[in-house]
Amino acid sequence: MPATDPGQPRARSPRWRGWLVNIGLALLILGGVQWWQARPLAKGEAPPLAGLDQTGAWVELRDLRGEPVLVHFWASWCPVCRAMDGFVDAIARDHRVLTVALQSGEAGEILSYLQAADLDFPVVPDPNGAIARRWGVGGVPASFVIDPEGRIASATVGLSTEPGLRLRLWAAKGGEAPRQ
């Protein structure tokens, strides 16, 4: 063991090392929370999802097979969902998207909300939470990416970013360039 001189100042660890440890711990905690919240979500084959959308047209998830689909559960009263509305709307312009409005009223109320927010994506109302229960959704927002064969490729609860959702859709397609 080397002798140390008590008069010699101790070498300090660089400050960045402490920051890295703290950032690593924060990411680990956030990842753990995300995993914990996603545990009850549906896995494997996507559960059935069908109903009248906000315009009165019949929509069915199985009719969207062949391309990846974003299935997004949201609520008009949820602030995080409102923060994601623009992401979902932008993604709906070049990907298949089907959303479910959880306990947000009937089709007319949802249509009014969409029009006021200048949003244009298909919405199936779920006033009593029956669809959400089939999918294991206990809180919103919840986002599922369905692969072209109808299997759940990824599922998350909470805030997701537009690039993150687009990346999941791209991966579900097998990493091919998005259609134009």
PLM regions and their residue ranges:
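Short, internal strand/loop/helix patches
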Residues: 111-149
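Conserved helix-turn-beta segment immediately C-terminal to the redox Cys motif
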Residues: 67-68, 83-105, 112-116, 167, ...
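Thiol-/selenol-based redox modules, centered on thioredoxin-like
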Residues: 145-180
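N-terminal targeting signals for export/organelle localization
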Residues: 1-52, 180
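Short loop/turn microsegments at loop-to-beta-strand junctions
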Residues: 47, 69, 140-142
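Short active-site neighborhood of thiol/selenol oxidoreductases, capturing the structured segment around
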Residues: 60-82, 88
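Short alpha-helical
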Residues: 79, 104-108, 130, 160
